[in-house]
Structures are given as structure tokens and as C-alpha cells.
């Protein structure tokens, strides 16, 4: 719906980026007792600094930027983001570091909103048990969506068995959106993996460390106007808003002067790379 970025802090008025850092003072759809905007203050924040890093020896180029967010009697942090590319790879290295500039603790929540395009008849593979206890569909309806009459019946089906959503069947009712919370497992290197395998053998991929992002959300949106797939959103909290997530124990307390970091890999895999990753995912799942 958007031809180019829009200069606004409103989340839904500048939408469609491949990767959006969400948080930090709030996250998700605000509940009735919340005051934060949808997905917090970070998504469209006006970064004060930006730079390029080029390493010819390593064959890498990175774009970096920093944003300082200060609210008197409340919050004072520095967020430093970076996106790196390496020659010969179609994967991006995405990182964020959040430094609490206060002397006192800071509450924070984070989610990496990485948006791929759903591919008709693509298949989802990821390091988690494929059952309703580990792949939990959201049954509440946030204020920013208006579901169709058959929506809740589809949600009830997925609540019993999440397997039908693994294939990107264009007939499935992902309109306007379906959201899951997933208990991801790490491999021997401490990494969780998720991918959308394309019919041609290539795949979209995202990988992260659950010790940095212990919560994982999946988002699927397939409408006549918008088509998006969050294969796996690395996060520290689910998306029910600050008050609800605080009650779940999902709000981090970052000590004064401390820094929180996350490192994510995302992008496109060749067919041989995708086949190898599928084997790694199966090995983790089969334990």
C-alpha cells in the first residue's frame, strides 16, 4: 500500500518495511490500561546518526544508526542498530544494542518484525514441536483489525492443531492476520531456525538466539491489499501490550548503565542451503 517510506511516528501510517525494530517502552497492541502506541516508540524513530562500515578484507558492508530516546522522569536510552551484508551470501546480519543511560533500572520489551512475502504453497519449517502446546494461536482480537465472519472458526481449528498453517495455501483465511506464540528450540550452537521453503527449493530464513530472545511470535497476513509473513519474530515478550506482558513476567529490567543486545540472521537461502537447513531443523525437532 505504500510506495515509499512516510515521515511519521504512527506505526500503521508507514508500513511495509522488511525489518522493523519494535519496542522498547511498550510492545504489541496496547490493552485498555496501556498508554504506549502500537509496537512502541522505536519502529519509526528518527535516528540522530547514521553511518556506513566497509571491510574489504572481510567482504562486508554494513549500515548503522543510533537513536537516543529521553523522557524526563522516565526513560533515557541509546539504541544502536546495524544491518550487515557479506559477499557471496543473501543473508543479512541484523543487530540492535540498547544501552540504559540512566543510573537506575529501565524496563524494556523488544520484537524484531521481519516481514517476508508469503509464497503460495510454500512450507514452514522451524525448530519447535509442531503441536498446539508449543504453537499457540492468538484467540483475542485486537482493536486494529476487523475479522471476517469465518475468521474465528479458522482460529479455533488452529487452536486445536496448528499444522494446517504450515502450507501457504492461498485458500486459508489469514485475513486480516493470524498470530502465533511459538516455543522455539535451539540447536547445538544456541540458534533457533525458521524458514519458508519455496516450491523451487529456495527458502526465506530467519535465525536467532533464544537466550537473547526467549519469546517467538509468528504473524501471517494475507488480504487482497497486504501480503506478509513473519516466519518468526525474535522477541522478549508477546504482543498483548505492556500491562498483559508485565503480568506474564515478559518485561525485562535493564540495570543502570547496562546494555542489552540481539543478533539475528535473515534473508534468502539457495536450494542446497535450504535442504541443509531442513536437515538441521529436523535434527533439533527429533532431538
Task: Enumerate the predicted regions with their spans.
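Surface-exposed acidic/polar loop and edge beta-strand patches at domain peripheries
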Residues: 1-87, 91-93, 104-107, 114-287
Amino acid at each position: 500500500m505504500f510506495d515509499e517510506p512516510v515521515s511519521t511516528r504512527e506505526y500503521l501510517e508507514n508500513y511495509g518495511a522488511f525489518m522493523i525494530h519494535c519496542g522498547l517502552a511498550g510492545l504489541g497492541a496496547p490493552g485498555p490500561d496501556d498508554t504506549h502506541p502500537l509496537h512502541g516508540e522505536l519502529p519509526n524513530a528518527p535516528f540522530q546518526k547514521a553511518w556506513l562500515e566497509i571491510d574489504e578484507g572481510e567482504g562486508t558492508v554494513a549500515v548503522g544508526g543510533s537513536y537516543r530516546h529521553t523522557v524526563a522522569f522516565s526513560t533515557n536510552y541509546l539504541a544502536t542498530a546495524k544491518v550487515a551484508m557479506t559477499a557471496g551470501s543473501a543473508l543479512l546480519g541484523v543487530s540492535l544494542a540498547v544501552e540504559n543511560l540512566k543510573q537506575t533500572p529501565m524496563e524494556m520489551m523488544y520484537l524484531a518484525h521481519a516481514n517476508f512475502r508469503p509464497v503460495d504453497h510454500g512450507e514452514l519449517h522451524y525448530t519447535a514441536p509442531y503441536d498446539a502446546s508449543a504453537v499457540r494461536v492468538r484467540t483475542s482480537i485486537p482493536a486494529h483489525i476487523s475479522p471476517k465472519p469465518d475468521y474465528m472458526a479458522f482460529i479455533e481449528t488452529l487452536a486445536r492443531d496448528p499444522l494446517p498453517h504450515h502450507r501457504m495455501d492461498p485458500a486459508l483465511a489469514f485475513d486480516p492476520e493470524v498470530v502465533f506464540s511459538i516455543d522455539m528450540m535451539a540447536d547445538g550452537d544456541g540458534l533457533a531456525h525458521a524458514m519458508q521453503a519455496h516450491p523451487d527449493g529456495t527458502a526465506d530464513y530467519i535465525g536467532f538466539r533464544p537466550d537473547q530472545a526467549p519469546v517467538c511470535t509468528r504473524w501471517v497476513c494475507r488480504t487482497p491489499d497486504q501480503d506478509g509473513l513473519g516466519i518468526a519474530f525474535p522477541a522478549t515478550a508477546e504482543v498483548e501490550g505492556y500491562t498483559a506482558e508485565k503480568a506474564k513476567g515478559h518485561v525485562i529490567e535493564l540495570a543502570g548503565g547496562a546494555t542489552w543486545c540481539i543478533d539475528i540472521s535473515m534473508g534468502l537461502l539457495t536450494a542446497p542451503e535450504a535442504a541443509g537447513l531442513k536437515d538441521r531443523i529436523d535434527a533439533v525437532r527429533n532431538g
